[in-house]
């Protein structure tokens, strides 16, 4: 029974199989009847017991066998050492014991280091973090790459271990190293959708402009894998956190990146950090940290902030000076928008929510520009025909064009109202669908607000054109 329960444990050597019954890591029942091992067992039998003790994680028996003369750096089948196996299963207690007995933390087998093995281990991040800390404390090199030129930080970023990434960088790991395909740690994090790691790597100086072998940047990799939030984050031309911690000493960097979580063991410290959200990243980059608490209290998201009007800025207590900083930053925002000419007459069913929202935002923005332009013309238009110094064509031509504009605006208003009704219908159907997972309320509320603004803007534009038409008729 015990033997069958233990057969599912990982096998050293990356899961390789062997037809031999003696594969070096056989899992079975361990006879503990004789604990007086010094000098009583042949060396081969001691090695066999040592392998089994390692496999089941029996720390006390491992220590006893080491005391009996077993080498701490003995190699088994596949050439793995006990320390490499302990790291592969994220057994921090075994790793500590073996290191204390003098195990080589810099051992490599087939271009795979023990540190890489720990970073790619199957286990909780807490246990992996412990193992990595122990190995780094024994001078394991965080920049040694495997055969695919992947370094430990790439494995940690790929597997979503945020604290491990931070710890590796604090001990000198290169952030912008590229593997055989041109992937960096940032590219791996973007590919797998690990937003917190993306934010931390940006803070640590990751270069988001580095391209893969096929010419893709991390933002494009994120978009290709449908991680739209990370795509938008990486699309900022301005990287507000880039290089923020690069000039600090190793000790200062550790203090900045890591804060003590708890001392659950007497002589070991766990580490954690609080990641910036999108809103914090944006505000810190502009030197507007003082606005963070105010905006969070009012449940204002980054997307909401970036689409605010002047009256909303004032209403939410944002000063004119801060408004100018935000508006200037908007010009630096490279959000991929749908061009009007790119839309075919057929509905693009594959359009994403972010792309559709960008379309509505751009439509609303263009309508706002048109309203401003017409208002400027109305303001500058002479109220008396005698003040017109240049030769004009018949006013009838102008009023005719204005009538067409009014008709077009009315048609546009009708279409937008239909679009709003259609979206509302879809929303109602999704809410009534028992299999649908409800999205956050702020998202749907904000989309509805955008549609309302667009409709109001178009109606206002039509009203201005109507006034313009009356002005020409009066003249």
UniProtKB/Swiss-Prot annotation:
ANK repeats mapped onto the chain: 45-74, 78-107, 110-144, 148-177, 181-210, 214-243
Function: Plays a central role during spermatogenesis by repressing transposable elements and preventing their mobilization, which is essential for the germline integrity. Acts via the piRNA metabolic process, which mediates the repression of transposable elements during meiosis by forming complexes composed of piRNAs and Piwi proteins and governs the methylation and subsequent repression of transposons. Its association with pi-bodies suggests a participation in the primary piRNAs metabolic process.
Residues recorded as bearing Phosphoserine in the entry: 17-18, 20
Keyword field: ANK repeat, Cytoplasm, Developmental protein, Differentiation, Meiosis, Phosphoprotein, Repeat, RNA-mediated gene silencing, Spermatogenesis
PROSITE patterns noted in UniProt: ANK_REP_REGION, ANK_REPEAT
A biological process from GO: spermatogenesis
GO cellular component, one term: pi-body
Organism: Pan troglodytes
Key word Kinase present: no
Protein name per the record: Ankyrin repeat, SAM and basic leucine zipper domain-containing protein 1
Superkingdom of the source species: Eukaryota
Localisation per UniProt entry: Cytoplasm
Region described as Disordered: 1-25
Record-annotated SAM domain positions: 272-334
SUPFAM superfamilies in alphabetical order: Ankyrin repeat, Pseudo ankyrin repeat-like, SAM/Pointed domain
Broad class of the protein's primary localization: cytoplasm
CDD domains the record matches: SAM_ASZ1
The protein's assembly and partners: Interacts with DDX4, PIWIL1, RANBP9 and TDRD1.
């Amino acid at each position: 029974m015990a033997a069958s329960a233990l057969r599912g444990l990982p096998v050293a050597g990356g899961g390789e199989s062997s037809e031999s019954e003696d594969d070096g890591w056989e899992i079975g029942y361990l006879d503990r009847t004789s604990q007086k091992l010094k000098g009583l067992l042949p060396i081969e039998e001691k090695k066999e017991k040592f392998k089994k003790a390692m496999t089941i994680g029996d720390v006390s028996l491992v220590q006893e066998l080491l005391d009996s003369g077993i080498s701490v750096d003995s190699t088994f089948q596949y050439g793995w050492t006990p320390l490499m196996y302990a790291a592969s299963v994220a057994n921090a207690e075994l790793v500590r014991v073996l290191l204390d007995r003098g195990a080589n933390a810099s051992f490599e087998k087939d271009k795979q280091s023990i540190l890489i093995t720990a970073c790619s281990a199957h286990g909780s991040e807490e246990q992996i973090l412990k193992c990595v800390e122990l190995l780094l404390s024994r001078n394991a090199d965080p920049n040694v790459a495997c055969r695919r030129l992947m370094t430990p930080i790439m494995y940690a970023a790929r597997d979503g271990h945020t604290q491990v990434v931070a710890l590796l960088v604090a001990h000198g790991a290169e952030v912008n190293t590229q593997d055989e395909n041109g992937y960096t740690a940032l590219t791996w994090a973007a590919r797998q959708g690990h937003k917190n790691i993306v934010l931390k790597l940006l803070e640590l100086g990751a270069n988001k402009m580095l391209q893969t072998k096929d010419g893709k940047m991390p933002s494009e990799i994120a978009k290709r894998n449908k991680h739209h939030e990370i795509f938008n984050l990486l699309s900022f031309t301005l990287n507000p956190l880039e290089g923020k911690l690069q000039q600090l000493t190793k000790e200062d960097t550790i203090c900045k990146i890591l804060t003590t979580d708890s001392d659950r063991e007497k002589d070991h410290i766990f580490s954690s950090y609080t990641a910036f959200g999108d809103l914090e990243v944006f505000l810190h980059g502009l030197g507007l940290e003082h606005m963070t608490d105010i905006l969070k209290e009012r449940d204002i998201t980054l997307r909401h902030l970036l689409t605010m009007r002047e009256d909303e800025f004032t209403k939410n207590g944002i000063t004119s000076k801060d408004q100018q900083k935000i508006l200037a930053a908007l010009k630096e925002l490279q959000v991929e928008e749908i061009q009007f000419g790119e839309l075919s007459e057929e509905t693009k069913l594959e359009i994403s929510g972010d792309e559709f929202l960008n379309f509505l935002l751009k439509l609303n923005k263009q309508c706002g520009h048109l309203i401003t332009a017409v208002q400027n013309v109305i303001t500058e238009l002479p109220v008396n025909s005698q003040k017109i110094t240049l030769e004009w064509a018949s006013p009838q031509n102008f009023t005719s064009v204005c009538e067409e504009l009014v008709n077009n605006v009315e048609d546009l208003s009708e279409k937008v109202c239909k679009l709003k009704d259609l979206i509302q219908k879809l929303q109602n159907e999704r809410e009534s669908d028992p299999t649908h997972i409800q999205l956050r309320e702020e998202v749907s509320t904000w989309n509805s607000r955008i549609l309302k603004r667009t409709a109001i803007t178009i109606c206002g534009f039509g009203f201005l054109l109507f006034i313009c038409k009356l002005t020409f008729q009066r003249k």
